[in-house]
Every structure is written in structure tokens, then in C-alpha cells.
Curated annotation (Swiss-Prot):
Residue ranges the record marks as coiled coil: none
InterPro entries for this protein: DNA_primase/NTPase_C, Helicase_SF3_DNA-vir, Phage/plasmid_primase_P4_C, Viral_Helicase-Primase_Cplx
The protein's name: Uncoating factor OPG117
Pfam families registered for this protein in UniProt: D5_N, Pox_D5
EC number(s) on file: 3.6.4.-
GO cellular component: host cell cytoplasm
Molecular function GO terms recorded: ATP binding; helicase activity; hydrolase activity
Length: 785
């Protein structure tokens, strides 16, 4: 190497930031000066408030420099963290520089690492609120062009590193005519913080990147190609705004149309001249037209529009490309279709192969962290900051405008790891399950190894269920309704009727409830009796709100309606609870519409009593009777003499513990799916059993005895008048006393007196103050000859 290149002890400095180029080239003593190292040290000592910035005097003639870095972290690290971070920092940057030097400069990888790690100086900032330093690798030399070419490599390192010091490398210093503040000097006269020397290096030349003193331990490398030739294969960086948006901005600047606009792409836009159709004067300089075309270049994260030929004949225009990274991250996450807005204004997210919804947890933040490693490196590092994650989350919420309809797959049962098709038994996981958007699931993982018919658990479970609901001819209808009701709890659709589990104490009702809860877990909810006895849509009602999208709702332990003061079951509530949407809001919330997919089961020891009975109510009630009693040995004899029980079985004291430990979870789930295919494919069916409710007996029978009178009955009036009917206002009517006489032939007044009176009070009309009548005709009076 030439001796001139091997040494430089003249340090060229600028006396302030922003020295004009002319003053720099002319070496105006007001703005620039050159020092020997000892002279520079004396100058700083004599002028403690001076501002000096080291730079190359003439980069064209001499551009040998030491490898240097400027690190500026907006946080103060304690001593232990700092020592750990600086050690990792040296290893990371030396490896990075060595790889670049080997690839682009033909340097020996091990020699670069050895020279960098063996000798370097480190300054320390006096600013206690931040961690800032300059590091000079004293025996590692290169050219300024090489450092500029290395800028992209160091930028990628800083973006991908977990080390806070590496992430804080200022790559902007790697440019033409770069400057670096001299140790011991201020940034500006009003700034009292400086960089100070640290042992073992106490000579100022050890802190100057333009000082060159090569020796046997030094290592030098430089680019094998020109800097201009080091153009990346793809110019467009992920951090830029989209190429389409950038070119549209360029087009708007010209106003005149670009004829070859469609020929431009991310790889050729810097080499293809722009062909302008000058319908109007040039928008940049107002000239009528130009002889030479305009062209684009990519510099400093911006598109530069310039004219070829004489560049001074038209203005240069800069189009910045810095996109909002946090906005771009939000857009990329939205593009994965992993966050959706529901009709209720809630957000559901796709994490770990399942849709998750919980308004009390920051699920979008969890999604951002889980998807971080799938994003480009320059984005993933941004998400390590909690503040930036919150910004991304806010961007995602703001960008979600259109809501989607969820939970529209009634024959699909969601799990934490996928979706089970109830019809064909297929289990979908991963992207195959993603299309089945849902806000609720069972909350546990499906295990196909346990979802089998032949297992010890299944054998035990079948015996338990056969004890609760025996497979006998007498109990056949009851057992069928039992299976239909429980299997309907898998279906995510509105059910047409409510089911009462009716029986004395210790007959298996609670055991059935616990088995069902174990099998569908989070799709099951237990609620209070108020949904049956209180007004539903009056004030906050968390019981109703908790029913939203649940597939099974259990209401346990109704009161003894024979007791005075006990509220009866409201028939209006029964009707509302079989509607697709139930009104009721949680406390401190405005969400009142709850989608009703639940099979509502009421287990009770007492006969249900309703405030009002009509046909609409009777179409909505089914009853499953439980007549097997599970008794302890001491009470078995008494139970066997109780007419309320068909059978008496010994109580299994350990059964509850097994159910709570989910021993029968997958066995019972298998049975439910089997029953579902038996009864509810292709259509989910639940039929009422009003004949099982004693209070419905009168209304069921009277519907077969009476019809409402109408105009078509008037021609029959000759015969009807002989049977006590009269014509009033052109309508065939039956006087009240006559009706009471006729109805007594069918109903015992002692047993059904209250029902008869209620029917009369509801339907009677007044001819005058004393005469009352009903607009009904007994069917036998119009069917008999």
C-alpha cells in the first residue's frame, strides 16, 4: 500500500453544523480549519465551548477512514445491562462488517473480526438521560464509499437485532461529506453535554475516524466494485409506501400524462426514461416542453425526479417514500384476515388455529405478538415496543369498517384447535377451520384418540345413562326425548321449545347437567330462575346477556309453586326465550341483542306453574321425566316404597369427582354426536310434549271441543237455536249459563273449575249489563245430524 495512504495526521474539522459547500471548498477559516492532533487538543482545551465536527478534507483525493459507529439510545442503561449489551454489540457488528467485507471486498473474514475486536475506543456521553457513544475501531480501515455501501447491511442488522445498542446505530452518518463530533466538544454552543474519553485510550487521535496510522496489526479492505454498481436486485424496500401509490404521486406532479406509465415497475423505474405528452407546459419549470426526457432515481428513501441532458434546465422534485410503518404493519395484519369485526361491534382474532373472542382480554395485542415473526424484519422489531403495539392495535380497530356475520354454521362444533363437522364427523384444523368464523367455542382441544366408541369410559357412561333413563318399552318415548334434547345442545341454531327435566330429588338430573357441561364446556352456561319468572326486558339482565351464542342454558332448582308468594313462570318469557334474538343487556353496556342458539333446559323437582296458558305456550314446552332414584343404602327401603320412582339404584359416591375430572368428556361428546346424527340430520327437530303438563290438560281438551263462531255458521242457526245458541250482531253466540252447563259434561268442576273460570273471563262478551255470552260453538253441535 502507498505510504501516503498508510498515514494521515492532519484532521480537517468544521466549526459548526451546516457549513456552506463553497466555504468548505475554499477552506474559509471562519468555518473550517485543519489541525495536527496535538494542536487540536490544545484548541479544545483553550476553547471549552467550541463546536468541532471531523470530516474528510477531499474525499476524491483521499477517503481512507477507520470503521466507526455512532450509537444514540433514548434510555439510560444501568452498568450491568450496559456491559452485557456492549459485549453483544461488539460481537454483532464485527460479524456483520466481516460478512460484508468478505462478500463485497474479498477480505479475510477472520482477520476483520480479529482487528475489530482487539482494538477499539469508546466515548461516553455526559447526558445522564440517554446512552450515547462513538466507537472507533482503531486498526480496521476502509474507504468512505465502502461505509456508504455498508449502510444497508448495518440498517438491516439494526432492524433485526434484539440488542438495544445495535438497534440504536445511526446509519445516517454513512454518506458523502459526513461529519462526526470531535470528542470533548459541544454539538452547539447552548448544549453543555459532550462525549468524553474512556480508559485505556487517553490520546485524542484514538477518537478520530479520519486519523490514519497503519501498522502490522492493521487491516484494510475496500470495495471490489464501484459504489454505483452496488444496486440491489430489488430497489423497493418493504418500509416504503406501495410502489403503485408512489408512481401515482409522480404522475400527479407532472400533470401531463406519462405515455409509458404502465411500463414502469419496481425493478426498472430508475432506468426507463419518462415519455411525457406535453399538452400543457412542464409542471416543474413551466417551459413549453423539454428536448431530453425526465428520469427517476432512488436516493435517501425518496424518488428524485430530474431531467437528463442539462439538469439545470428543469427543477428537481423529491417524492418521499417513507410510509407509516405502524400503519403498514396494521394493513399487513388485516390482509391475513386474522381480525374480524362482528355485528355487535366486537373483535374476534385467529390465534393458534382457532377464533378467539373475549372482551376482557387484549386479544388483538396477543395476535400482533403472535404474528410478529411472520412480518419482514424491519417491521417485527417495531412491535417490541408496547407503545407502538398499542398504535398498531388502534390502527387495526380504525381500519375495520365492515362487519361480518359469525356463528352461521349450526352443524359445526368449534374447539381450541379446530372445528368438528357434526354431520360427517370430519375435523377441520388450521386454515381449513379458519373459514368457520365463530365467537364462542368449547374452550378445549379436540382429541380424536379419545373420541372413540370402544373405551372403558364409554362402557361406564352407557351404564350411567341407562340407569338414569332406562331403555325399556315403558320409558321409550321419554328416553328418545332425553337424547333429542341433549344432542340438540350441539346445534348452533334457535330451538323451538324449552325442555323441563322433571323428577324427584336424586334422579340423575344434576348428573346429566354435569356430563353436558363437561362435554361442551364453554358453550354451556347456567343461569337463574329469574329468566322465567321476572320481566326480561326491564333494566340490565346479565342472565340473558350471558346466553349470547351459548348452545346450552341450564336453569336449575325452580321454587315450589305451591308456596304462597312464589312467582309463576311467565308465559311471555317462554315465548321470548324461543325467539332468535333475546333482548337483555349486561351491566354497564349498551349491547342488548343476544343471538339465541341455546337449548334451554329447566331441571326441577316441582310441577311447573304458568301465569297464563294458551296454544302458543303449549307449543313451546317439552318434559322429560326422571323416575330412577339413586339412594344411599340407609334410604333404599323407603325409596323402593315411593310411587314416584320406577327403580331405585345405589348412589355412586365417586361419580361426581369423575365427571368433574372430565373422565367422560369425549365419551359423552361421542354419544351426543351419535344422537345428533340420529335425530337432527338433516333438520334439527325438537317437539313439545304438552300432554305431560297437568295444567295443560284442560286447554288441550277444550281445543278439541270448541271452534270460534263465524259467518258460515249462520245458516245452521235453525238447528243451533234449539240447542241454546242465539244470534247477536249477526254472530252465532252461546249464553254464558248455557256454556257452563255444556262444559260441565266434559270437565269436573272441582278439578277444572279454575281453568273454566279463567277461560270464560278471557273470552266472554257483554250483550248488556246483565247478559254475557261467548262466541264459541261446540263441535258436536254442528257435526251431529
Amino acid at each position: 500500500m502507498d505510504a501516503v495512504i498508510r498515514g494521515n495526521d492532519v484532521i480537517f474539522v468544521l466549526k459548526t453544523i451546516g457549513v456552506p459547500s463553497v466555504c468548505r471548498q475554499n477552506e474559509d477559516p471562519r468555518f473550517v480549519e485543519a489541525f495536527k492532533c496535538d494542536e487540536l487538543e490544545r484548541y479544545i482545551k483553550n476553547n471549552p465551548e467550541c463546536t468541532l465536527f471531523e470530516s474528510l478534507r477531499d474525499e476524491e483525493a483521499y477517503s481512507i477512514v477507520r470503521i466507526f459507529m455512532d450509537v444514540d439510545l433514548d434510555a439510560c442503561l444501568d452498568e450491568i445491562d450496559y456491559l452485557t449489551a456492549i459485549q453483544d454489540f461488539i460481537i454483532e457488528v464485527s460479524n456483520c462488517v466481516a460478512r460484508f467485507a468478505f462478500t463485497e471486498c474479498g477480505a479475510i473474514h477472520e482477520n476483520v473480526i480479529k482487528s475489530m475486536r482487539s482494538n477499539f475506543s469508546l466515548t461516553k456521553s455526559t447526558n445522564r438521560d440517554k446512552t450515547s457513544f462513538h466507537i472507533i475501531f482503531l486498526d480496521t480501515y476502509t474507504t468512505m464509499d465502502t461505509l456508504i455501501a455498508m449502510k444497508r447491511t448495518l440498517l438491516e442488522l439494526s432492524r433485526s437485532s434484539e440488542n438495544p445498542l445495535t438497534r440504536s446505530i445511526d446509519t445516517a452518518v454513512y454518506r458523502k461529506k459526513t461529519t462526526l463530533r470531535v470528542v470533548g466538544t459541544r454539538k452547539n454552543p447552548n448544549c453543555d453535554t459532550i462525549h468524553v474519553m474512556q480508559p485505556p485510550h487517553d490520546n485524542i487521535e484514538d477518537y478520530l475516524f479520519t486519523y490514519v496510522d497503519m501498522n502490522n496489526n492493521s487491516y484494510y479492505f475496500s470495495l471490489q466494485r464501484r459504489l454505483e454498481d452496488l444496486v440491489p436486485d430489488k430497489l423497493w424496500e418493504p418500509g416504503f409506501i406501495s410502489f403503485e401509490d408512489a408512481i401515482k404521486r409522480v404522475s400527479k406532479i407532472f400533470i401531463n400524462s406519462i405515455i409509458n406509465f404502465n411500463d414502469l415497475d419496481e425493478n426498472n423505474f430508475t432506468t426507463v426514461p419518462l415519455v411525457i405528452d406535453y399538452v400543457t407546459p412542464c409542471a416543474l419549470c413551466k417551459k413549453r416542453s423539454h428536448k431530453h426526457p425526465h428520469q427517476l432515481s432512488l436516493e435517501n428513501d425518496a424518488i428524485r425526479i430530474y431531467k437528463t441532458g442539462n439538469p439545470h434546465s428543469c427543477k428537481v422534485k423529491i417524492v418521499p417514500l417513507d410510509g407509516n410503518k405502524l400503519f403498514n404493519i396494521a394493513q399487513r395484519i388485516l390482509d391475513t384476515n386474522s381480525v374480524l369485526l362482528t355485528e355487535r361491534g366486537d373483535h374476534i382474532v385467529w390465534i393458534n388455529n382457532s377464533w378467539k373472542f373475549n372482551s376482557e382480554e387484549p386479544l388483538i395485542t396477543k395476535l400482533i405478538l403472535s404474528i410478529r415473526h411472520q412480518l419482514p424484519k424491519e417491521y417485527s422489531s417495531e412491535l417490541l415496543c408496547p407503545r407502538k403495539r398499542k398504535t398498531v392495535e388502534a390502527n387495526i380497530r380504525d381500519m375495520l369498517v365492515d362487519s361480518v356475520e359469525t356463528d352461521t354454521y349450526p352443524d359445526k362444533l368449534p374447539f381450541k384447535n379446530g372445528v368438528l363437522d357434526l354431520v360427517d364427523g370430519m375435523f377441520y384444523s388450521g386454515d381449513d377451520a379458519k373459514k368457520y368464523t365463530c365467537t364462542v367455542s368449547t374452550g378445549f382441544k379436540f382429541d380424536d384418540t379419545k373420541f372413540v366408541e370402544d373405551s372403558p369410559e364409554m362402557e361406564e357412561l352407557i351404564n350411567i345413562i341407562n340407569d338414569i333413563q332406562p331403555l325399556t318399552d315403558e320409558n321409550k318415548k321419554n328416553r328418545e326425548l332425553y337424547e333429542k334434547t341433549l344432542s340438540s345442545c350441539l346445534c348452533g341454531a334457535t330451538k323451538g321449545c324449552l325442555t323441563f327435566f322433571f323428577g324427584e330429588t336424586a334422579t340423575g338430573k344434576s348428573t346429566t347437567k354435569r356430563l353436558l357441561k363437561s362435554a361442551i364446556s364453554d358453550l354451556f352456561v347456567e343461569t337463574g330462575q329469574t329468566i322465567l319468572t321476572d320481566v326480561l326486558d326491564k333494566g340490565p339482565n346479565p342472565f340473558i346477556a350471558n346466553m349470547h351464542l351459548k348452545r346450552s342454558v341450564f336453569c336449575s332448582e325452580l321454587p315450589d309453586f305451591a308456596c304462597s308468594g312464589t312467582k309463576k313462570i311467565r308465559s311471555d318469557n317462554i315465548k321470548k326465550l324461543t325467539e332468535p334474538c333475546v333482548i337483555g343487556r349486561p351491566c354497564f353496556s349498551n349491547k342488548i341483542n343476544n343471538r339465541n342458539h341455546a337449548t334451554i333446559i329447566i331441571d326441577t323437582n316441582y310441577k311447573p306453574v304458568f301465569d297464563r296458558i294458551d296454544n302458543a305456550l303449549m307449543r313451546r314446552i317439552a318434559v322429560v321425566r326422571f323416575r330412577t332414584h339413586f339412594s344411599q343404602p340407609s334410604g333404599r327401603e323407603a325409596a323402593e316404597n315411593n310411587d314416584a320412582y320406577d327403580k331405585v339404584k345405589l348412589l355412586d359416591e365417586g361419580l361426581d369427582g369423575k365427571i368433574q375430572n372430565n373422565r367422560y368428556r369425549f365419551a359423552f361428546l361421542y354419544l351426543l354426536v351419535k344422537w345428533y346424527r340420529k335425530y337432527h340430520v338433516p333438520i334439527m327437530k325438537l317437539y313439545p310434549t304438552p300432554e305431560e303438563i297437568p295444567d295443560f290438560a284442560f286447554y288441550l281438551k277444550i281445543g278439541t271441543l270448541l271452534v270460534s263462531s263465524s259467518v258460515k255458521h249462520i245458516p245452521l242457526m235453525t238447528d243451533l237455536s234449539k240447542k241454546g245458541y242465539i244470534l247477536h250482531d249477526n254472530v252465532v253466540t252461546l249464553p254464558l249459563t248455557t256454556f257452563q252447563q255444556k262444559i260441565s259434561k266434559y270437565f269436573n268442576s272441582r278439578l277444572f273449575g279454575h281453568d273454566i273460570e279463567s277461560f270464560i273471563n278471557r273470552h266472554k262478551k257483554f250483550a248488556n249489563v246483565s247478559d254475557e255470552y261467548l262466541q264459541y260453538i261446540f263441535i258436536e253441535d254442528i257435526s251431529s245430524p
